[in-house]
From Swiss-Prot:
Keywords: Membrane, Photosynthesis, Thylakoid, Transmembrane, Transmembrane helix. It comes from the Bacteria. Signal peptide: none annotated. The gene is ycf4. It is found in: Cellular thylakoid membrane. The keyword Transmembrane applies. This is Photosystem I assembly protein Ycf4. InterPro entries: PSI_Ycf4_assembly. Belongs to the Ycf4 family. The chain crosses the membrane at residues 24-44, 58-78. GO terms for cellular component: photosystem I; plasma membrane-derived thylakoid membrane.
Length: 185
């Protein structure tokens, strides 16, 4: 959760999506690498150097040129997918908690359409902190909803905030919703 606008009866949280610096860096690397592999493959087929570095026209088209072409196609498909996710800002949205209407509204950008979840305060059982450390650490806040097995995550994907900040946000939200806070040991 990037920014919080808090008043006495309302909390608004903005969630960042896929427009992160790491996605721009990976997208740029995939673009350069994918085009480079395709140009090397075409150079080995035509016998003309299309790249300023190296001598790809000296490569045999079978098997090196074909393999480099396949790598280039795969890289460009991944590249297209990643840039599309960045373009639509996949996963961005907002959380809105309103005490006056006793409702929660969660909005996210999906792949093909937007996702909206509306809940009443009565449906929320507790606020859960899902914290795991190790090789793939995870620190997220989720709502435990009555009648649902899995908690509904409300923090952004891929966010790794300091533990104290996650605990404070979870405690503030649990106090605002007047429910228990789970997950602290």
């Amino acid at each position: 959760m990037n920014s919080d606008l808090t008043s006495f009866d309302k909390i608004e949280q903005k969630i960042d999506g896929s427009r992160k610096i790491s996605n721009y860096i990976i997208g740029g690397m995939l673009t350069i690498g994918g085009i480079g592999f395709l140009l090397a493959s075409i150079s080995s087929y035509t016998g003309r150097d299309l790249l300023p570095l190296g001598n790809p026209s000296a490569l045999l088209f079978i098997p090196q040129g074909i393999i480099m072409g396949a790598y280039g196609v795969i890289a460009n498909l991944l590249n297209f997918y990643l840039w599309y996710m960045v373009y639509i800002n996949f996963g961005s949205g907002s959380n809105s908690f309103d005490k006056s209407s006793k409702s929660v509204e969660i909005k996210r950008k999906g792949l093909f359409k937007d996702i909206e979840v509306r809940l009443d305060f009565d449906e929320i059982k507790s606020v859960k902190l899902d914290i795991s450390e190790g090789f793939n650490p995870r620190r997220r806040i989720a709502l435990v909803i009555k009648g649902r097995k899995k908690p509904l995550p409300i923090s952004g994907a891929g966010e790794l905030k300091p533990l104290l900040q996650v605990e404070e946000e979870g405690a503030r939200l649990a106090k605002f919703l007047n429910v228990n806070l789970e997950g602290l040991k």
